[in-house]
């Protein structure tokens, strides 16, 4: 267990290295921070921190930098989450409230996260497996052609054309629309098949074929749109890796191109708190020089998707965690109100 003084030294090393991007020496630490001890004592503390693997000496530099282990202790014990200021919160809310649909919400969220954190932003579309049906609309386009519109609780809208086996009248259409919504509105996608199993029975024989076709189209839509989707932005921020940029950029970009890798990373976010994966804690080798900060978001207090950022391990953890958490909260509010 590290002493309180050595924890203060480690915190100072992390803060200085993040701020200056240069290895940190004992003289600089005593000048910049009120540690209450001499440079010689700080040197001894740094030697102990190095022996325990919390800091390391890069190449021949006289200074030290945090290791993954050092960053982990900093995040778990020393960092806390930096809250957003009132003007920042208002700016986030106003920007997100301008969205016109779900795609716009996700696009604005990506742009906002990248700007706030100066990292690569990754936002997962709300998962339909966790979604509920808000409404199913049926529109007549021709005597034997309908449009089915599925609207989810997260504001996602899916449209499908339905070619009917026979003409379908307005009265039958209104009846089907009412019966269908009475069964599925507010229910989870996974429950829908069982809920509509016998829906065609009350209809006249000549209409049952169309009702069955509509139900088949609805169920196919639920399956088709179950594929997970992501949006990424701010890859230009990778240049903030600094001196190591030429060495790390290719493997990081390759990892970011693999959607399954990103989905797995975001999937590690624990509800409701912020999850931080540092350096070699990331299973994908291409991301061993990065940290991933992620959190779930959704309406009604239940996460339906994840969002987060990817950046160098040398990141402002308190600020990044605060921004990710705040954006997730406001996105959830927007979805609940949409």
From Swiss-Prot:
One of its GO terms (molecular function) is DNA binding. InterPro entries: GAF-like_dom_sf, HrcA, HrcA_C, WH-like_DNA-bd_sf, WH_DNA-bd_sf, WHTH_transcript_rep_HrcA_IDD. The keyword Transcription applies. The keyword Transmembrane does not apply. Keywords: Repressor, Stress response, Transcription, Transcription regulation. GO terms for biological process: negative regulation of DNA-templated transcription. It holds the Pfam family HrcA. PANTHER family: HEAT-INDUCIBLE TRANSCRIPTION REPRESSOR HRCA. Belongs to the HrcA family. Negative regulator of class I heat shock genes (grpE-dnaK-dnaJ and groELS operons). Prevents heat-shock induction of these operons. This is Heat-inducible transcription repressor HrcA. It comes from Streptomyces coelicolor (strain ATCC BAA-471 / A3(2) / M145). The lineage of its organism: Bacteria, Bacillati, Actinomycetota, Actinomycetes, Kitasatosporales. The gene is hrcA.
């Amino acid at each position: 267990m590290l002493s309180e003084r050595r924890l203060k030294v480690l915190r100072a090393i992390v803060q200085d290295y993040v701020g200056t991007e240069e290895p940190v020496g004992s003289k600089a630490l005593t000048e910049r921070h009120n540690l209450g001890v001499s440079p010689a004592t700080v040197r001894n503390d740094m030697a102990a921190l190095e022996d325990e693997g919390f800091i390391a000496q890069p190449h021949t530099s006289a200074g030290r930098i945090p290791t993954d282990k050092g960053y982990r202790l900093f995040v778990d014990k020393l960092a806390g989450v930096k809250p957003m200021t009132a003007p920042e919160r208002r700016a986030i809310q106003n920007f997100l409230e301008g969205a016109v649909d779900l795609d716009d919400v996700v696009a604005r969220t990506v742009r906002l996260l990248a700007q706030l954190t100066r990292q690569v932003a990754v936002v997962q579309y709300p998962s339909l497996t966790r979604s509920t049906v808000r409404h199913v609309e049926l529109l007549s386009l021709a005597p034997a052609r309908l449009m089915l519109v599925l609207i989810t609780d997260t504001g996602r809208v899916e449209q499908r054309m339905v070619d009917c086996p026979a003409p379908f009248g307005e009265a039958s259409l209104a009846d089907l629309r009412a019966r269908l919504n009475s069964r599925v509105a507010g229910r989870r996608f996974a429950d829908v098949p069982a809920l509509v199993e016998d829906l065609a029975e009350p209809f006249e024989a000549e209409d049952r074929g169309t009702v069955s076709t509509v139900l088949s189209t609805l169920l196919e839509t639920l399956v088709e749109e179950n594929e997970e989707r992501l949006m990424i932005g701010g890859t230009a921020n990778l240049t903030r890796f600094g001196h190591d940029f030429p060495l790390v950029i290719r493997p990081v970009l390759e990892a970011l191109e693999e959607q399954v890798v990103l989905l797995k990373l975001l999937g590690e976010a624990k509800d409701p708190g912020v999850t931080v994966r540092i350096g070699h804690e990331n299973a994908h080798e291409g991301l061993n020089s990065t940290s991933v900060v992620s959190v779930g978001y959704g309406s009604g207090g239940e996460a339906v998707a994840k969002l987060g950022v990817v950046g160098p391990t040398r990141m402002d953890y308190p600020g990044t965690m605060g921004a990710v958490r705040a954006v997730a909260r406001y996105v959830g509010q927007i979805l609940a109100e949409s």
